[in-house]
Design a protein with these regions (language model features):
Chain A
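N-terminal cap/lid segment of alpha/beta-hydrolase-fold proteins
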Residues: 1-11
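Conserved HGGG/HGGXW glycine-rich cap/lid loop of the alpha/beta-hydrolase fold
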Residues: 12-69
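Conserved acidic catalytic loop of the alpha/beta-hydrolase fold
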Residues: 80-98
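Flexible "cap/lid" loop of the alpha/beta hydrolase fold
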Residues: 108-116, 122-149
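Active-site nucleophile elbow and catalytic-triad environment of alpha/beta-hydrolase enzymes
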Residues: 166-183, 198-200
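Short beta-strand/loop motif that positions the catalytic acidic residue
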Residues: 187, 193-195
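Conserved alpha/beta-hydrolase "acid-adjacent" motif
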Residues: 200-206
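Catalytic histidine-centered segment of alpha/beta-hydrolase-like enzymes
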Residues: 222-234
């Protein structure tokens, strides 16, 4: 686990070489809101699945999360601040291009990074993500107080060890300040969408995939919380990145 | 060479969690598994987790069905583990596992630069 200065925040990340050294494009894993690399990806078996396929894994804790700094100012969480961190990380590691694998908010940021710097992104796999507004009807001045799907997510993650509820609230407001738009879509970056069949936060993923020339894989029986560890998801991503 | 049966229980997954739901077995009865290979995918109230195999061995019994809720400490899998015949056994009930070679570290450790 290493940390570096990417702009205004110190970012913690891991850099995991593959089990079989290979010169494949590294994979940058972007976790979801309120989690971190270890919880979203490591515990769910992703480094093993990707490393076993000969892929180097780069796993940051995004700003406001895990072992990275947690500013309290919502402007620090605009999507472009995250993409600047990630480009800073790639520069620091002297990595020209990566494949992206995101989950939930991490997928939204993967889309943003592919839009901002298409020359740095070879392919992007977006898990647990669709064009619906994740913050619909939520009062972001007091996240967790209401009863919307986002309030429920917020209550769960704000209670996790190591999380800072105030930073997460600022993060939600920063993300919500730039509503997702399906147009323009990233150019020249093949996209894969993967989502649980019961994932309401990924509603519309199939249509979004069709609109931007991507493919969509559905994980039977899974919802937003439990699709991330699925073998179907991992296999779809490995096939997409290595196949 | 002989085989001993050893049963692995649902480990403490941290944060005060007392149970987990089995989502999907990654192994079947009769499979030979390597240590650290994916064993079972479980879901807690906090997250979805893949539990790696604690040992190399052959799967003898899976103690929970998919979608079943398992308390921490309850039996999860029984393995038949190969033991060498000349391994010291006298006076030991069960078996002291032989420590295997440490897996190569994949995490680079470097102190924070701040």
């Amino acid at each position: 686990m290493t940390a570096n200065l990417a702009g205004d925040v110190t970012m913690r990340y891991v850099d995991l070489p593959p089990s079989e050294p290979a010169d494949a494009v590294p994979v940058l894993l972007l976790h979801g809101f309120g989690t971190n690399f270890g919880m979203n990806w490591s515990a769910a078996g992703w480094p093993q699945a990707l490393g076993g396929a000969g892929l180097r894994v780069l796993g940051p804790d995004l700003r406001g999360h895990g072992g990275s700094d947690k500013p309290l100012d919502e402007a620090a969480y605009l999507p472009e601040r995250f993409t600047a961190d990630l480009l800073g990380l790639l520069d620091e590691l002297a990595v020209d291009r990566v494949d992206l694998v995101g989950y939930s908010m991490g997928s939204r940021l993967a889309w943003e990074l592919a839009l901002t710097a298409p020359d740095r992104v070879r392919r992007a796999a977006l898990g647990g993500f669709g064009p619906v507004n994740a913050f619909a009807d939520a009062d972001l001045s007091a996240p967790g107080a209401g009863d919307t799907p986002f309030d429920q997510v917020f209550r769960t993650v704000s209670g996790l060890a190591g999380n800072d509820a105030e930073a997460l609230a600022a993060c939600a407001r920063g993300q919500a300040a730039r509503p997702f738009a399906a147009d323009p879509a990233p150019v020249g970056v093949p996209l894969l969408f993967v989502s649980g069949a019961r994932d309401t936060l990924a509603t519309g993923a199939e249509d979004l995939a069709a609109r931007c020339g991507g493919t969509h894989v559905e994980i039977p029986g899974r919802d937003h919380a439990n699709a991330v560890s699925s073998r179907v998801f991992k296999q779809a991503v490995v096939d997409f990145l290595v196949g | 060479m002989a085989e001993d049966n050893t049963t692995f229980t649902l480990p403490d997954l941290g944060e005060g969690l007392v149970e987990a739901t089995v989502l999907e077995w990654q192994v079947a009865v009769g499979d030979r598994v390597e240590r650290n290979a994916p064993l079972v995918e479980v879901e807690t109230t906090k997250s979805a987790v893949v539990i790696p195999s604690p040992t190399e061995g052959r799967v003898v019994t899976l103690h929970a069905e998919e979608n079943e809720v398992v308390p921490v400490g309850a039996p999860l899998v029984t393995f038949a583990v190969t033991v060498s015949d000349d391994a010291p056994r006298a006076g030991i009930v069960g078996k002291v596992p032989t420590e295997e070679a440490r897996p190569a570290r994949r995490v680079r450790l470097k102190p924070p630069t701040d």
